[in-house]
Regions:
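Alpha-helical transmembrane segments of multi-pass membrane transport proteins
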Residues: 1-458
Length: 458
């Protein structure tokens, strides 16, 4: 009964418009004070215990900072040019190139909203110029942007790994095949629609443009090699890889591409050689562009970590009340097998994803369903990818789908119009969710092959 009161408080606060983090934290603290034996003096200790051991979360601010520099530094323009050179000549070529560019940028940013902003700002305008409807363009980008949390490195995967104490490296590997499959399914869908509607296609620009655009984008794309190669080559931990990625992204954006900082020039003008402005080596660190990128990354980090911190308090309360064990006992005694259990998990996450930010929802739900999944023999990495895919869908379902709001701003469209535009492609993601849920080898083959199965010792 007490736990029902806790969830009632959370839902009631969300319904009256209380921010998610405040609703989670305030409800949990009220529960500790009123409905449990915990004293006010012990709440700080409870908060400390909730945060203790989650050192993997240190990777999040660095990945956000790397994404901020990459978004500011014009890497997106080069990735889009490269994508158009490769797939732009197919029917619906610019839309397909938009999805391909989102896949590449997702491997740099780890964030869906950042992917929508960086790629959508350019691609939606370009699609309108060559004859696509604004609705079609917005629907493509809203859905393709969700790949930002599925293709590694992914901030949401880091949160899941921290909440369940599984390997971040295995989670990143597990996201590769599903990420490529989701992107391919979206591109094939666009191709079929383009053939039916006779949508415009570009010209084949030749291998010279492919190589030229690839060389132009290679410094940005090399970040993928640094992160994944560093982790799986045993050079970095995931947290160290995130920190190195942030430094590398700053150097590329400021000193190589020179799209930000003291060496930046208006588009179409030649770059300023470093020897003509040597003071840039120092002033770049305090330049307005750098400060802006740091400020934006800091705001997002504080928002995200505040949600996670309050969700961890709720997780701590639920664990103390032995809620996961009670749920596991009830479901197992009711005869739930793996198939039915995964149906229930998907329903819970799809509903929750409509109202909550992905990281906070995972911190709450993962500890509840994780013990049951282990009892049923479900691979913890497979469970993690299922949860991430559900979070993808949650980001494009109202009323709180973040990608819908971001796409609405980028495309200059009312939110409900973006929702309607995204629906046809949302159906593709539902089919993809079924595949990922019931074909576990899609998620487990790479991590099991290269790193062995995840071993849960507690």
């Amino acid at each position: 009964m007490e736990v029902a009161a806790l969830f009632f408080m959370i839902v009631a606060m969300l319904l009256i418009g209380t921010p998610i983090a405040v609703a989670l934290g305030l409800s949990s603290i009220t529960f500790l004070l009123v409905l449990s034996d915990t004293s006010l003096a012990s709440i700080a200790q409870t908060f400390f215990q909730a945060m203790a051991g989650h050192y993997t979360l240190l990777a999040i601010p660095f990945f956000i900072l790397a994404s901020s520099f990459m978004s500011t530094g014009g890497v997106a323009k080069r990735i889009i040019r490269f994508s158009i050179a490769i797939v732009g000549h197919f029917p619906g070529g610019l839309a397909i190139a938009g999805v391909f560019a989102c896949m590449l940028f997702a491997a740099l940013s780890g964030s869906s909203p950042a992917t929508v902003v960086a790629i959508g700002t350019i691609v939606i305008a370009g699609m309108r110029q060559v004859g696509y409807s604004k609705d079609f363009a917005a629907g493509v980008i809203a859905n393709a942007g969700t790949l930002g949390i599925l293709i590694p490195p992914s901030i949401v995967m880091v949160v899941y790994a921290s909440a369940t104490d599984v390997s971040v490296g295995r989670m990143f590997l597990a996201g590769v095949i599903p990420g490529l499959l989701a992107g391919t399914m979206l591109m094939v869908t666009i191709y079929v629609i383009a053939k039916i509607r006779n949508l415009p296609k570009g010209e084949w620009l030749g291998w010279q443009e492919v190589f030229a655009s690839g060389l132009d984008a290679i410094w940005g794309l090399f970040l993928i090699v640094i992160i994944l190669g560093g982790i799986y080559g045993g050079i970095f931990t995931p947290t160290e890889a995130a920190a190195v990625a942030a430094v590398y992204a700053f150097l590329v954006a400021t000193f190589i591409y020179r799209d930000m900082g003291p060496l930046a020039t208006p588009e179409g003008q030649p770059n300023i050689p470093i020897w003509r402005k040597p003071q840039a080596l120092l002033t770049a660190f305090v330049h307005r562009d750098t400060r802006d990128a740091l400020f934006q990354a800091g705001k997002l980090t504080i928002t995200l970590m505040f949600i996670i911190a309050n969700a961890l308090i709720l997780k701590h309360v639920l664990t103390d009340e032995q809620i996961p064990q009670q749920i596991a006992s009830s479901m197992l005694s009711a005869g739930f097998g793996p198939i039915m259990f995964l149906v229930v998990v998907n329903v819970i996450l799809l509903i929750g994803g409509q109202f909550m930010e992905p990281s906070g929802l995972i911190v709450i739900v993962a500890p509840l369903v994780f013990p049951i999944a282990m009892e049923l023999g479900i691979d913890p990495i497979h469970l993690g990818i299922i949860m991430v895919v559900n979070m993808e869908i949650g980001m494009i379902t109202p009323p709180v789908g973040l990608n819908l709001f971001v796409t609405s701003g980028v495309a200059g469209m009312p939110m409900m119009r973006v929702v309607k535009a995204a629906l046809p492609f949302l159906a593709v993601l539902f089919v993809f969710l079924i595949l990922v849920t019931y074909v576990p080898v899609l998620s487990t083959w790479l991590p099991n092959t290269f790193m062995g199965p995840e071993l849960i010792t507690k």
